[in-house]
Amino acid sequence: CNVLRDDGVTYHQYLNELTYILFLKLSEVKGFEEHIPEQYRWRSFVEETDNTESFQRYRSFLAEVSNETTSAGIKEIYANASTSLRKPVNFNTLVQAIDDLDWYEETDRDVMGDIYESLLEKNAGEKKSGAGQYFTPRPLINIMVELMSPKLGERWNDPAAGTFGFMISADEYLRTKYDNYFDLSEKDRKFQIEKAFSGVELVGDAHRLALMNARLHGMESEIILGDTLTEMGKGLNGFDGVLANPPFGTKKGGERPTRDDFTYPTSNKQLNFLQHIYRSLKKDGKARAAVVLPDNVLFEDGDGQKIRRDLMDKCNLHTILRLPTGIFYAAGVKTNVLFFTRGTTETENTPGVWFYDMRTNVPNYGKRTPFTRTAFNDFIEAYTGGVKPDSLTTAFDGTINENARKKVDNERWQYITRATIAKKNDSLDLGLIADDSISNGDDLGDPIEIAKEALSELESITLQLQAMIKELG
C-alpha cells in the first residue's frame, strides 16, 4: 500500500486496484477461471518476468474482460474498469504479495479479509474520496448485529449496502456460533453462504467493493447494483431482518421516489428508506430491524409524522439509541439507531419506546478518543435487561424482556409511553437528559468543532429548504 501511495494512488483508487487483482487470484483459488480468457489468468501474471509486458497485458485485460466473459459476477467486478497504476513494477509488487499468501489456509484468507476491511475504513477517512458516507463504524455495526441476534435459516438484507459491512458482520456472528458452518448439511451451508444475506447498492464503486468484500469473507451473496427507492425495490420483501445505515441527505433536486407502493412518498431519503425497511419485513411478530437514522427523521412534520405513526402502528418500535456526535465521517451529523420488530397486525404494535441517551455529556470521539465497543457497555446492559457486555453473544438471544428492562437503574435509560409520544405530535426527538444532570461532563467539546458542527447543520437545513421550495414549485 505504501508503494502505491508513493505512486500518487489514493486509498479509493488502491481499493479498486486491489479488487481487480484479488478477484483474479480468487478465480484461481475458487476454480472458476474458465470464465477468464487464458492469457489473462492468474498464473500468466505471476510467471511473467517482464514487468512491462505483464502490466500491458493487465491493462488489456481490464479493457476487454467485461465483453469477453460469460460470467455475470466477473462483468460486475470489472464494469468500466481501468488502472490507476503508473509504474509496471507496482503491479508486479501487488501480484507477488497476493500470491505469497496461502489462500488455501483459512487464517490467511481471514487476514486478507481483515486487510481489505481496514483499507475500506482508511478510504472512508480520506475526505477527498467522499467514501465516508458508505462507512459505518465497526463497533456500531457489531453491536447492532449482536442485539439483533441473527439465526440460521433467516434471510437478512441491507437496502443501502455500502461495502456490505452489516451483512459481513452478521455472517461472522453466525460463523463464530456455528463452527464456520462446518456442521451444517450441504443444503443449509449453501443457503447461509448464498441466500442468507443480500443487499442493494446504488453507487458503482461501492457496489464493486461490496462484491469483493463479500467474496473475501467467503460469502456468495446477491448484491444488486440499483436503487432501492425505485420500482426494483418493491420486490425486496419477506425478510427476517434488516440492518442498514441509509445515506444522509435529501434526494437529489428534491425528487420523490419512483415507488408507487409507498403510502407517504417524500423527498426525504431516510424517511423513504425507513418506509421501505418496515414494509420489507415478514409480518410474523419476529422479523426485526436496526437502522441508523439522523435526528430529522425523529421530528420532521407532515409526512414525517405520518411515517413515524405508521411505523409505530405496524411495528413495535421498542428502542431508540441516541448516538454521540463525531462517530461518522460526515462531520456534525446527529444520528440514532431505531430498533423495531414487525407485528402480525397493522395497528397499535408500539406500547411505548425505551430511549438511551449516549449523546449528552460524553467525550468528543475522534483521534484522541477513539470510538470503541466499550462505549456501548451501559447501553448493552440496559437494552438486554442486565446481560453483561462480555457475554452478549452467548447469553442474549434477541428477546426483549420488558420486566428486566424496568429494573435497570441508569439515568440515561427512560421509557416513554405511546400516549405521551402522541401528545407530542408523534415526535421521537425525546430521551435526551438535561446537560447538567450528569456529573462527568468535563469534556464538552472544542468550540471550533462545535462551530463546524453548527455550520454543517445549517448547510443540511438549507438543502432541505431548497428541496421544499422546489417541491412547492
Name each model-derived stretch.
Residues 14-16, 202-207, 267-340:
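Conserved Class I SAM-dependent methyltransferase catalytic core
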Residues 232-234, 249-252, 299-302, 329-332, ...:
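Switch/connector loops and helix/strand junctions flanking conserved nucleotide-binding motifs
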Residues 238, 242, 333-334, 349-352, ...:
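A generic structural signal for well-ordered coil/turn residues at beta-strand boundaries
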Residues 95, 190, 218-223, 253-257, ...:
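Short acidic (Asp/Glu) and glycine-rich catalytic loops that position anionic groups and cofactors
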Residues 130-244, 249-251, 258-260, 267, ...:
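Conserved S-adenosyl-L-methionine
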Residues 195, 234, 256-262, 322-323, ...:
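Short beta-alpha connecting loops at secondary-structure transitions
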